[in-house]
């Protein structure tokens, strides 16, 4: 059974904290965290990401960005990344986790989720919609 899920993006301030919170809301009994491949360590969630998430009832208020580590990878049952190239980057940190590293967009046709950082509000809205859809598909798959 998958009890711990790690959501990964680059900076851990836009996509992964949003994905983490969406999964946490739907799967409160599971341990869900997020981290970044090149995290803005100690930073809070991006302001626009926070505003957009909040408007959809998801709070990123107390998020603190953290750097992905080999131990985090080892201790997670499932690692969800935003882009295909992130799979290789995660595996450079801990090569043993390849079999449990998948795209967050796996259930929506292996869709990659673009980074909205420093882009328009519309970009953040679009990314939120994709994350929400993908998270629901993961919830459905993990609840079987």
Swiss-Prot record:
Protein name per its UniProtKB record: Probable low molecular weight protein-tyrosine-phosphatase AmsI
UniProt enzyme class: hydrolase
EC code(s) of this entry: 3.1.3.48
Similarity comment: Belongs to the low molecular weight phosphotyrosine protein phosphatase family.
Gene3D superfamilies tied to this protein: 3.40.50.2300
Protein's job: May function as a phosphatase required for amylovoran (an exopolysaccharide that functions as a virulence factor) production.
Active site: 9, 15, 115
Record keywords: Exopolysaccharide synthesis, Hydrolase, Protein phosphatase, Virulence
Catalysed reactions listed for this entry: O-phospho-L-tyrosyl-[protein] + H2O = L-tyrosyl-[protein] + phosphate
Any one GO molecular function term: protein tyrosine phosphatase activity
GO annotation, biological process: polysaccharide biosynthetic process
Signal peptide coordinates: none
One Pfam short name: LMWPc
Naturally occurring in which organism (per UniProt): Erwinia amylovora
